[in-house]
Amino acid sequence: MVSVANTQLKIATFNLFNYLEPPNAYYDFERIYSAEQWAKKQKWITEYLREYQPDIIGFQEVFSPESLKELVATQGYHYFAFVDQPEVIDDFIYRSPVVAIASRYPIVDVAAVTANTKLAQTLGLVDDFSFSRKVVRATIEAPHIGNCDCYVVHFKSKRSMIEVDEINNEWSPEKVIIESLKASVAGGWGATIQRGSEAALLMIEMIERREATNNPMLLIGDFNNTLTDGVLNHLLTSTLRFVSTIDRDAYLAKYCLNDAWNLFEVSLTNEGNEGNEENETSRKVIAKRAPTHYFGTSSSVLDYVLLSCEFDASYHDSLYQVSGYDTYDRHLINPIFDRDGESTDHGIVLITLTLRS
């Protein structure tokens, strides 16, 4: 039985960046952690868990799920689930890492989410459309709120789906550039179609599951895209055109998702309106959302936690509100090799949910 004494619930999304136990290699035969590097990576992970104490964690880039299961168990996460295995392309060379979820609270059901292939065909996608990485749905018995469906994703990356074979073609330098450009345009768009389709078809499955169970929903993961550029913004659909307004908003609230950051901003605004000087200071300090990924001189938010209305303080029947939002990025903006040399290339997003009084 889950204790109702707990008034807070912490949720994290954590891209582990090639979590593969040696002597196996990721992608290439030379990419193998030494014993020292592996110990360093595991220590970095456990130190984060020990310091920030998330209750539920969605992991991405997991090549060694059994090893990860053992590691997090040492930190009190006795419930762990995954629904797929990485691909082995040689005796010891791995690719296609999987996602996983760890929880301090009981996982009572686990499933791999599958796309509605008939709907995929209607959208003009291939007949056997599937997620580039299988999506985990774990139903967790959380305090106060009961069974909660937690989805962990790692949507298709922006990497081009078309590779140029320069080696086996005797091309001029100009021809190489032309073919690379064509591959980049077409292959990049192909990746975008896959990523956006994954999000849309997952959302359909989440809505149908919600209709059947009425379980609260959390969507956790590395989206490989910002939520605001149009490719994934249907995950936050909150309006419908040409639909009767009678009961519309109430139904939409039940089936739609909210970005945890936006809910956190609302809670800060509400606290600020109370005139508390300390709250006003915290609003100014946390005025801008921190990026979770850096590439060259650019940065973006790629890692998200989305929540159903039970976690939205503005919803009349909500049980929790988002009281904290932290992006752990010290290893990205001020790395120290001895400490962060085997960390990750993503920031770790952690949200704190507090029971409403």
Language-model regions: role of each:
Residues M1-P97, V176-E179, N214, I333-G347, ...:
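N-terminal, active-site-proximal structural segment of metallo-dependent hydrolase catalytic domains
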Residues V153-A183:
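A structural motif
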Residues Q8-E21, N147-K156, S180-G188:
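Active-site-proximal beta-strand elements of phosphoester/diester hydrolases
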Residues F14, Q60, V153, G221-D222:
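Active-site flanking residues adjacent to catalytic metal/cofactor-binding acidic residues
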Residues Y19-N24, R159-M161, S314-Y315:
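Short, solvent-exposed loop/turn elements at domain surfaces
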